[in-house]
Regions:
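N-terminal, positively charged nucleic-acid-binding surface of large information/translation enzymes
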Residues: 2-143
């Protein structure tokens, strides 16, 4: 990496792990950032691209009830299927975070249940909270 290179973070959507990915996922949220990551790497930039399976939500519970299994069974199954599908399509999702640390780039397709993921989210939330970026207020909600 040269002195002119930059650190680039590409954050990709985290779809629910309640079923297999479809063409809309690939064209809409995975192919564009993969192209961007490849472009940035071609410029010599250090790129970290992150995404994964969102393992929380009603769609997972509904699928589990329909299949007669636990929500954990559903997310385990579809995280594996979806991460393999993206790699098979040639997307940059091989688990290849640089051994020196995430600041040196790579790709990470993770899970919201991962302990490290939980810690990072909590740390960032606390930093934003302490910096005054959140405001508590009441608003009407229409449903």
């Amino acid at each position: 990496m040269s002195e002119d290179s930059e650190h680039v973070l590409i954050c990709v959507a985290w779809p629910y792990a309640n079923g297999p990915l479809h063409l809309g996922h690939v064209a809409g949220c995975y192919l564009p950032p993969d192209i961007q990551a490849r472009y940035e790497r071609s410029l010599g930039n250090s790129v970290l691209m992150v995404s994964g399976s969102d393992e929380h939500g009603t769609p997972i519970t509904v699928t589990a009830e329909q299949d007669g299994v636990s929500p954990q069974d559903i997310v385990d199954k579809y995280h594996m299927i979806n991460s393999k599908a993206l790699r098979d399509l040639g997307c940059s999702w091989e688990p290849n975070v640089d051994s020196r640390g995430i600041e040196f780039g790579g790709a990470l397709f993770n899970r919201t249940s991962d302990e490290e993921h939980k810690l990072i989210v909590q740390e960032n939330f606390k930093k934003l909270l302490d910096a005054g970026f959140f405001e508590r207020k009441t608003t009407p909600q229409y449903y």
